[in-house]
Amino acid sequence: GSEMCIRDSITPVFSKDNELTINHAAFVETIQDAAQSFFSGERVEQADIRVSHIIKGRIPEAIHKPANQLLESDKTIYYERAAFSIDVPTIYETVGENKLNLSIVGVRAYNQMNLYSKKVPELFRLAIGFKNQVCCNMCIFTNGYKDDLRVSNTTELYRAALELFNNYNPAKHLYLMQQLGNTSMSEHQFAQIIGKMRLYQCLPTGYQKALPRMLLTDTQINSVAKAYINDENFGSFGSELNMWKFYNLLTGANKSSYIDSFLDRSLNATEMAVGINAALHGDERYKWFID
């Protein structure tokens, strides 16, 4: 599977000084080690890895061979983007009748780095949060997400991971999610929010800047609407929709995101659900979405 293909991949280098980048396999292993050491005594599963955007090449000796004569050993590959998740199933809680497991997610995208330069710190994204076992939706809260982790070697990466795990407050995060289940909205309010989310994307930039960010695409907003009608776990057509279910409609729609925008949108789903929940209780910041 993906585990094998990232081990057999070549490692891109910085072209000005030929210095190695930290490859995907080293990224996964480093975070796996950090998780096992931080959560010692818990069951820490092996990473589940996804890769995309394959980049193929040939070794120099095979440059002049016709394609049909290439041996496997003549070919090189690497993947521009990789993501993985590591579950810790012994740390779990039930929210809104759904079992949530602690989960760590990492994302790496070479397309967001300048490989044409000399070696500079490399960009990684790392999150710790809870994964909904019913649907595998990922729940991420601000203090569990580093969207701009820049490190030069695996030692720094390991240290940054431990720091993130240490700063994360699972009890606070769970409390926040449990609160969502206590508020509901009518179909009319839901339709209003969906409409406003669609309008949001067409607003002039200045107007948009004055509002909280909303990162879901048009297609994703449509799938939130579809899931509201059809989803067996979180659909609420014909009845009140509680905010925990609304939140899961958002995180569910985010599953169609490319690897490199997935975590930002996961966090944004939390911001939207918590913000709209507060607006329903009279808070001003997300008021525009419900008016």
For each feature predicted by the language model, list its residue ranges:
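Acidic, low-complexity, intrinsically disordered interaction modules
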Residues: 7-17
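Amphipathic alpha-helical segments
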Residues: 17-45
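A short acidic/basic microdomain associated with nuclease active sites
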Residues: 38-76, 80-83
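Intrinsically disordered, low-complexity regions enriched in serine/threonine
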Residues: 67-291
